[in-house]
Amino acid sequence: MDKMLEISEEAITRYFTTLSQFGYKKYSDVDKIIVLFFMEEMLAGEMSYYVTQDDYRNIVNALYCLAGSTCMIDFPMFESYDTLVHSNNRTFVPRITEDSILRSTEDDNFRVEA
């Protein structure tokens, strides 16, 4: 929820910056910021206990509609620390299990069935 709060803070900062420079902002943009604050309050406040999985999915879809529709609400940043190349462990020798013909003890003595 901290990321949602950061997006809300950035939106209100941009709103007041625009308001101080131009003196006016369209009501539709202000309504979108109010909806953003309502969603943040609903997810972080006392109403979060009543939000179901379907409600959460609808809120996420609404946030994607809000993000980028106005210059006030920025798209969220997704950071991926994953790489395209993954190391594999091919240097490991596969263990001979008890299904195998050759079995050994903990002292590396072979067990032979008579």
From Swiss-Prot:
Protein name per the record: Tail hub protein B
Keywords: Viral tail protein, Virion
GO cellular component labels: virus tail
Keyword Glycoprotein: no
Subunit: Heterotrimer with THA. The heterotrimers further assemble as 12 docking hubs that anchor the trimeric tail fibers.
Entry's localization field: Virion
Function: Forms the tail hub together with tail hub protein A (THA).
Main location: virion
Organism encoding this protein: Bacteroides phage crAss001
Source organism superkingdom: Viruses
